[in-house]
């Protein structure tokens, strides 16, 4: 029997929700964090190692995959799931954010965007229909609408024009979308930090009708307080039985605040990028493994983590790997950071189901504000004598 795409609520605390996202490629507990696999790979990770962190869904990118290796090639090779060895759900970004970030390399009109590849300068064209067709060729479980992402800050009239163009494009994306059991298309809510424009965008998208709704155009320099205010004004307007996705967010603290405001899905390059630059997320904040203080530290990154970096290796070894520019360092820290993000999401889900999110959130924030574990709190392991 085919699976209908749907989000089913399990529990609620205030505006925070726990539930399950049912798709053609499996069921994903929410709230969930999606590791970013832009070009068909989560950087520095095998897909087995991504699975081992507890991730249930990953993200790919239309812009990058259309340029290399090409959507039709991916289709001919069995689709993105087979190509990258990920049988679970895949959400593909539409390419809009990347194209709009090209600056002088792109030209926007009412129909779409013409741009030059950042790889070889070749000319390409993306329209709502073309973006949707590419995502279909990739066999994305969740297809995103093609939208314009204006740089902030910008005058309200500029944001309004951009949002209304994105809404017209959303209608064209919906027309081009090929419905299939267990697959979905999400509309993207725009409007900057203007509550009235966000409300107008929600009305336009719900009038078209999508399986899910994303909140775009945030985490672009507006600051956490304004981001939260925008979520407070926007999230309650989204249909309660639809999944809600906050695009490109964020830090652990951002995730917690957004979950408290009713968001279900997230993606961000932070944990993987941090791992490649020697930064490790922990319950006590962020560690920089290049710092000399770790050079002789035999302890793991965190006493609470069961990733390979923490169960098999010391801070001293990880410090050495980065000082020696060994590729294993970024691999192990990326693994650790993704494991931390998934553990963070599991903890929030469990607290929502248990009805204890308030206390759980207070505990998370209190520990993030603390210093690194002392040797008394996390003693070094006993080392065998050197023969």
From Swiss-Prot:
Q: What cofactor does this one take?
A: Zn(2+)
Q: Which residues bind substrate?
A: 93-97, 147, 190, 217
Q: Which GO terms describe its cellular component?
A: cytosol
The enzyme's first-digit EC class, named in words, is: transferase
Its UniProt entry gives the catalysed reaction(s) as: 7-aminomethyl-7-carbaguanine + guanosine(34) in tRNA = 7-aminomethyl-7-carbaguanosine(34) in tRNA + guanine
- Reported function: Catalyzes the base-exchange of a guanine (G) residue with the queuine precursor 7-aminomethyl-7-deazaguanine (PreQ1) at position 34 (anticodon wobble position) in tRNAs with GU(N) anticodons (tRNA-Asp, -Asn, -His and -Tyr). Catalysis occurs through a double-displacement mechanism. The nucleophile active site attacks the C1' of nucleotide 34 to detach the guanine base from the RNA, forming a covalent enzyme-RNA intermediate. The proton acceptor active site deprotonates the incoming PreQ1, allowing a nucleophilic attack on the C1' of the ribose to form the product.
Q: Specify the protein name.
A: Queuine tRNA-ribosyltransferase
**What lineage is on file?**
Bacteria, Pseudomonadati, Pseudomonadota, Alphaproteobacteria, Acetobacterales
Gene name per UniProt: tgt
